[in-house]
Regions:
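Short amphipathic alpha-helical segments
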Residues: 40-43, 176-183
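Catalytic activation segment of kinase domains across protein kinase-like and atypical kinase folds
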Residues: 174, 193-278, 283, 327
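Conserved beta-strand elements of beta-rich interaction domains across eukaryotes
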Residues: 26-27, 34-37, 103-104, 209, ...
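Short, hydrophobic/amphipathic alpha-helical packing segments
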Residues: 180-192
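N-terminal targeting/trafficking signals and adjacent low-complexity tails
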Residues: 43-50, 57-61, 65, 69, ...
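ATP-binding glycine-rich loop module of kinase domains
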Residues: 9-77, 82-87, 97
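Conserved N-terminal boundary motif of the eukaryotic protein kinase catalytic domain
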Residues: 1-9
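Conserved structural core of kinase catalytic domains
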Residues: 61-178, 213-220, 224-245
């Protein structure tokens, strides 16, 4: 039996709220609604359930996982009488979402990540021994390359709780980023056409699979892992029309650079975009089915994203040209 006196500790913070868990053998996490205004764990809960239902109906073929959504707790729920004392002094009751905890990256692997990206031995030792950096999850950024000139001081500004792993770093480590792109394409198609939501601000992380999982990405560097989707508090319903597509396009471009982008800086980025695009259209067609009145929407969405990517690339080139002209003057 879990120890109900075992204290919760904060394992993450976001604009919606803080995330807590106890090292007592349970596998749940508590997301408190104590963040910025306008964010709602109630919406998180409802969208989470809707996406789980869609995933159950359209089973992904890739190693994709969604945390189980267990319960929504209100501030007057009896749960707080039994558990409030497990939070630090001064914390009060609030709405909270209880869901399955994503397994953390083992220390042996997160230590290798520190060695790879941190050349400062004193800082490296601190991060390896820091309890706050114990809950390591990896954010796969297929839409961004990290500059080779990145230095140690930049490392000091991010936590092992959410390590950004950029596409060129995946290439260097021999990770199967093509499979990651296919998995994201499947997930996006499932959310848009199965759950009918815009997928706004959802996050993808690489982490170990559930003990019961039969599918995973093999990797000598990261060990067996899967791709998890989380954070649904900003997700909204989308209509199956042009307005809904524009909403989905804006969400795609606004999100952190998890997905491949059509405006990448290298030829390999363009190839990965086309692979992602092809997989998204293929999976979308399977979900919508033959004869669907919405059959043309997935391709139109890709067109909107490509148009926006082209606009952003041109704007970036214009800024670079102005900067070069200024330097010459």
């Amino acid at each position: 039996m879990p120890n109900t006196n075992n204290p919760y500790r904060c394992i993450g913070k976001g604009f919606c709220g803080s995330v807590w868990a106890a090292e007592d053998g349970t596998n749940h996490a508590i997301k408190r609604e104590d963040g910025g205004p306008g964010r709602s764990v109630t919406n998180d809960y409802n969208m989470h359930l809707q996406i789980i239902r869609s995933a159950n109906q359209h089973r992904p073929s890739m190693p994709l996982a969604i945390p189980q959504c267990q319960s929504l707790i209100y501030s007057n729920n009896m749960w707080w009488i039994e558990n409030l004392h497990r939070f630090p002094a001064g914390f009060t009751e609030c709405r909270a979402l209880i869901s399955e905890r994503i397994p953390k990256i083992p220390r042996s692997i997160s230590d290798k990540i520190v060695d790879l990206f941190c050349s400062d031995t004193s800082l490296s030792a601190f991060v390896k021994g820091n309890e706050d950096d114990d809950c390591c999850l990896i954010r796969p950024y297929l839409g961004r390359r990290r500059g080779r000139e990145a230095n140690t001081s930049r490392f000091q500004r991010f936590s092992l709780r959410n390590v950004p792993l950029h596409i060129n770093q995946m290439e260097d480590l021999g990770l199967d980023y093509v499979a990651y792109a296919q998995t994201m394409a499947d997930a996006l198609a499932m959310m848009h056409w199965g759950a009918k939501v815009d997928a706004n601000d959802v996050e993808f992380v690489l982490a170990p699979p559930r003990a019961s999982s039969s599918s995973s990405f093999p990797s000598h560097y990261l060990g067996k892992h899967v791709m998890w989707i989380l954070d649904f508090d900003c997700v909204r319903h989308m209509s199956m029309d042009e307005a809904g597509l524009k909403q989905a396009c804006a969400a795609f471009m606004r999100n952190d650079p998890f997905y491949p982008r059509p405006d990448g800086t290298e030829s390999a980025d363009g190839a990965l975009w086309w692979l992602f695009r092809h997989r998204f259209l293929q999976t979308s067609a399977e979900i919508l089915g033959d004869g669907s009145p919405h059959a043309g929407l997935p391709r139109r969405l890709m067109e909107l994203i490509e148009e926006e990517g082209c606009r952003r690339r041109k704007k970036k080139e214009e800024i670079q040209e102005r900067d070069e002209d200024t330097e010459q003057d």
